């Protein structure tokens, strides 16, 4: 099926959902050669991935993912595509901790660095939070703290077959989109950042087809796969089965506009220090972008009625010490599970 799919793509034809699912299944099952995988990913990128294709690919990955042992209503994921080349600090990871401090249940799906110096797994480890919990321990951590980390290589072991070709291609591929679309815990609510605003309506449509109830798919005008404080943020909001697109500016939420360089991070330890400083009350660009994205999560999870009130609440959580206490709680619970195993 992969050979057939590749032939169709080279003819400029779009794949059906079924063909896409079967083709990705062959890759996930180790039935494709590295050359076939590389050609498939590169030609697909050149053609442009369509909604039905992405749905099929995501279904193939979800079918092969390790099972997460519990289902919780209102579960949120904050996971971006990466690949934006911005080298910012780990904004969505920091924002997830803020939202968890207000009682939002978050199953953060992520990995180590691919295109940056520090992935979500790297910075959490630098903050003292173990990331390689078993599914049972991760579920227990979620129950106890409202936050757990789902380490992608553990849950998506079939992805190893595509790892080599992806690394050698060294370009964005459909797998950048698929990571955020395949949360092992089946999160029903999602803040998903993408690297190109043109992807927003299609990705929102895919999330709807994958039974996500509410989503904010976002892209910064500066290329960030986050809500940004350097300029305009583009949003596709999925709610009640409908998709609404709109734009926001940082000034709408009482936030200053900053230069992109002020958001730049470094390695995991440098990014951990930035996050620790934000949680300790430091003012500036890092705080403002965390407030904006955490406020969006609180709105997404129906903790507040608007992103604006979410930003205000996020500031209260940080300044009241609740976010730092949440980080310490997660560190204690997850660390205890590692030592006990």
From Swiss-Prot:
Catalyzes the transfer of the phosphoribosyl group of 5-phosphorylribose-1-pyrophosphate (PRPP) to anthranilate to yield N-(5'-phosphoribosyl)-anthranilate (PRA). Mg(2+) 2 binds at residues 225-226. It is an enzyme of class 2 (transferase). GO terms for cellular component: cytosol. Binds 2 magnesium ions per monomer. 5-phospho-alpha-D-ribose 1-diphosphate binds at residues 80, 83-84, 88, 90-93, 108-116, 120. It comes from the Bacteria. This is Anthranilate phosphoribosyltransferase. Pathway: Amino-acid biosynthesis; L-tryptophan biosynthesis; L-tryptophan from chorismate: step 2/5. Keywords: Amino-acid biosynthesis, Aromatic amino acid biosynthesis, Glycosyltransferase, Magnesium, Metal-binding, Transferase, Tryptophan biosynthesis. Homodimer. Its cofactor is Mg(2+). Anthranilate 1 binds at residues 80, 111. Pfam families: Glycos_trans_3N (PF02885), Glycos_transf_3 (PF00591). PANTHER family: ANTHRANILATE PHOSPHORIBOSYLTRANSFERASE (PTHR43285:SF2). GO terms for molecular function: anthranilate phosphoribosyltransferase activity; magnesium ion binding. InterPro entries: Anthranilate_Pribosyl_Tfrase (IPR005940), Glycosyl_Trfase_fam3 (IPR000312), Glycosyl_Trfase_fam3_N_dom (IPR017459), Glycosyl_Trfase_fam3_N_dom_sf (IPR036320), Nuc_phospho_transferase (IPR035902).
